[in-house]
Amino acid sequence: MKNRVLVVDDAAFMRMMIKDILKKGGYEVVGEAEDGVKAVERYKELQPDLVTMDITMPEMDGITAVKEIRKINPDAVIVMCSAMGQQAMVIDAIQAGAKDFVVKPFQPDRVLEAVKKVIQ
């Protein structure tokens, strides 16, 4: 069975790129969200195996969304995909419960490597 993924980013182009990378890698993208509030709602509704999460988004940022999702499911698997790659931001994301952090702009292989590593 394919692993089910929720893609969260406020940029439609970035969601499309990540979805394309994941589909080519054999993953099933079951949903997407453009902000943290919708990400939490979609997570509850879809219960995906993995979430890719941006940090800087309207309504609710990605780190807050990670914390909210981890309240719903402490075992939630979340990979951050963000241009906010400063060390402090990466540490905040990991402490919030993210399993890995991919810095934009990224190579498709780096996204697949991160997803594969955390989903096993």
Question: Model regions: which residues?
Answer:
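Two-component/phosphorelay signaling modules centered on CheY-like receiver
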Residues: A12-G31
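Acidic catalytic/metal-coordinating carboxylates
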Residues: D35-K38, D61-T64
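Active-site beta3 strand of CheY-like receiver
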Residues: L46-T52
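Receiver (REC) domain active-site loop signature in two-component systems and cognate sites
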Residues: M57
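Short, conserved "switch-loop" micro-motifs in signal-transduction and mechanochemical regulators
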Residues: M84-G85
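C-terminal output helix
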Residues: F106-V115
